[in-house]
Amino acid sequence: MKIIIRKGIKKDLSSVLNLIKELADYENALDQVTITLDDLEQDGFGIQPCYWFLVAEKDDEIIGLSFYWIRYSTWKGKFLFLEDFVIKEEYRRHGVGSKLFKETIKICKQLNLNGMIWQVLDWNSPAIDFYKKFDAEISKDWLNGRLTKLQIENINKLL
């Protein structure tokens, strides 16, 4: 199976959104995906892009996605934050994920980053096992905090 890994471009965004939704569905959170193609285009290809991505391609079909941005740690400096990493279900366990993940790791070297960080659901043992093949540390120490846009708007009304 010939797989091409390349930097994502604007015309890939429809396939990217489909993969984002496929991952969200797998994580039982499809109803939480509110991003649109217009949002992705503006945020990734506008004046100040805030994310980048790699795609895995087979016969001109996008079958994998590594979606990332640069995060800054006040303790350690710059890191690649891997927001989404997904391979279409029918292509999993064929080496596509490993190839895409290795190319993502290369970006860390190219950009002189101090590492790569991501989140994985504690019940997603196939993903955890995949990351452990790369000797990744899977932390159980940190809890994630979040405020939604609506919560922020409500708080701002009180200020």
Regions found by a protein language model. Name each.
Residues 4-16:
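A short beta-loop-alpha structural element at the N-terminal edge
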Residues 17-43:
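Conserved GNAT-fold acetyl-CoA-binding loop/helix
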Residues 44-54:
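A short helix-loop-beta-strand connector motif used in the catalytic cores of GNAT acetyltransferases and
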Residues 55, 61-69:
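Conserved beta-strand in the GNAT
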Residues 93-106, 133:
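Conserved acetyl-CoA-binding loop-helix of GNAT-fold acetyltransferases
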Residues 98, 110, 122-140:
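Conserved active-site alpha-helix within GNAT-family acetyltransferase domains
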Residues 109-119:
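Conserved GNAT acetyl-CoA-binding A-motif
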Residues 118-127, 146-149:
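Conserved beta-strand-loop-alpha-helix junction that forms the acyl-donor binding cleft
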